[in-house]
Amino acid sequence: MIKNPNPKFTFTPSKSRRVFCLLFLGAAAAAAIGAIASSRVSAEPSAKAGAVTRGGQRVGDNAFHLGKIAPWVTEHTADGQQAEFFVVLADQADLSGAANLPTKAEKARYVYSTLVDKSQTTQEPILQWLRDSGIEHRSFYIVNAILVKGTREIAEALAARPDVARVEGNPVIHNDLPSPGPVEESPSQPATIEPGITYTHAPLVWALGFTGQNIVIASADTGVRWTHNALKPHYRGWDGVNGNHNFNWHDSIHDSVGNPCGNDSPFPCDDFFHGSHTTGTAIGDDGAGNQIGMAPGAKWIGCRNMDGGDGTPARYIECMEFFLAPYPINCTPNEGDPTKAPDITINSWGCPPVEGCSANTLQAAVEAQAAAGIQMVVAAGNAGSPCSTVEDPPAIYEKSYSVGALTTGTDNIASFSSRGPVTVDGSNRIKPDISAPGTNTRSCSNTGDNAYTTASGTSMATPHISGAMALLWCALPSLRHQITDSRDALNNAAVHIGSTQCGTAGPPNNVYGWGRIDIANAVGMPSPTPSPTPTPTATATPSACGPASPTPTATVTATATPTATATATATATATATPTPTPTSTPRPTPTPRSQPTPRGRPTPPPRP
């Protein structure tokens, strides 16, 4: 087997690589789903590739065929240029059968096998033509598509096939990530829970013993500094002594130049700060007073899908495949194990159509995760305050749980938070779905194992909701992996905030969605009225998440608010709709939109 100099375009694993992977997977997994076809041949594409004829007519001359090709592809293959593009097949998998399966493991296995079977039975004729023509390519299964590097003639030849639905670009997307504030080491201030965490009423849920135990949250971002003191204890690959990154980490960055994490990092590494920060807000707690995370009892895994903030649809899809069925380091999706899939994913990134990202490219992958019982939580975007600025995939999709940002400690929408309705796809869908604190959020930095920084953005609001979902599923296991019912539970329990800026007041509306997250209300507890800047302390007795109702063992005291004693017992009734706290309809208070600074390249942690 020829060595592949560019892992972006992969081969069927060599014999030695198969043996390596089988050591992890065992004979049962080895006998499972067959290889996902992908190959690369070093030769340049054959000149005859674009001269294929059918019935004496040169392929690609027909306007219908050319209409399948996205404008980005046409532009970037002009004058003989080569570009990367997706060949999306017309025959996509039907995953509706997963809805009738009772457990996450059954859903995930069904979705994985259905998708892989569909890709194998439909892609082979195209793959064979690409191999014969010496054209670089890689197969994907979560979207039945093939990534190709080729010329305009190759794109036209593929578009002419009746089994091809469209040819879409793989542009480099420059995410406008928030800028970090000053970095602090070993903060000396009294131990407190972060104000944004308190404002969601998460500590009241902790007091019942529900901290997210047995829930796994996945980070799709710039990577994660896994050795950080607030993250390492919560990494699924850490057993207290050693780190095991198999099934717990994947790097989709294969061809970066000068990235501090390099390419194909075999261990979690963050090349900016963004991924460590968002992961910390979801699950972070160093055990020494830095209570920065919503669900400190949950575990995390990760996949780097951005190179210092720059992503591509292929990188995004590669990470979504890894989350659907994680696989060991140095292995391929063929060795995936869907039973190791996370429960929830954090997605503080976007794929703007204005940069060439098709509104359709990622949709099938998002829907596949939902069918498998994985909740994809997505940042609404930082293009506010005009209406219809929720315009980037994946935030625009129905199956994405899209999050707006509040000015922390208030019920005012942040000025930068994107608004709906979604018009880019013609749906007029109400977005965001829900809102959470997203300004001056303190969490992990990637510059050191005891370093913290602050940042603002819908990126920061998103992990609050990922953590809230983990707490919900921990407290009410009957809702676990029931995506629609779980979202309804959080939406109905939210503090509804009316706004007519971009449509009717709702709820929901196109500014706040259903309103501010209130996780205590969602699990059936009465919630106190928070102060603008609470500084609570809490001590929770951990318990295994399950159907039994735990006995409260802690009192949560919030400074400058009435003392709330956790005496309510969480119930597992998913049908009751909690009564929302009555609120007035505030006018959004404008706040200055922070401008990103040039992305730094901090030194990554030492290789374990």
Task: Give the label of every model feature segment.
Residues 43-48, 527-607:
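Ser/Thr-rich, Proline-interspersed low-complexity disordered segments
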Residues 46-48, 52-55, 110, 161-216, ...:
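Protease zymogen maturation seam
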Residues 52-182:
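Inhibitory N-terminal propeptides of secreted protease zymogens
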Residues 61, 72-75, 194, 292, ...:
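C-terminal subdomain of the subtilisin-like protease fold in secreted/lumenal serine endopeptidases
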Residues 80, 98-99, 166, 193, ...:
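Subtilisin-like serine protease catalytic core
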Residues 242-250, 394-474, 521:
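Extracellular S/T/G-rich loop segment that most often corresponds to the catalytic His/Ser-adjacent loop
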Residues 301-309, 438-506:
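Hydrolase catalytic cores
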Residues 323-357, 379-380:
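Short acidic, glycine-rich surface-loop motifs adjacent to enzyme active sites
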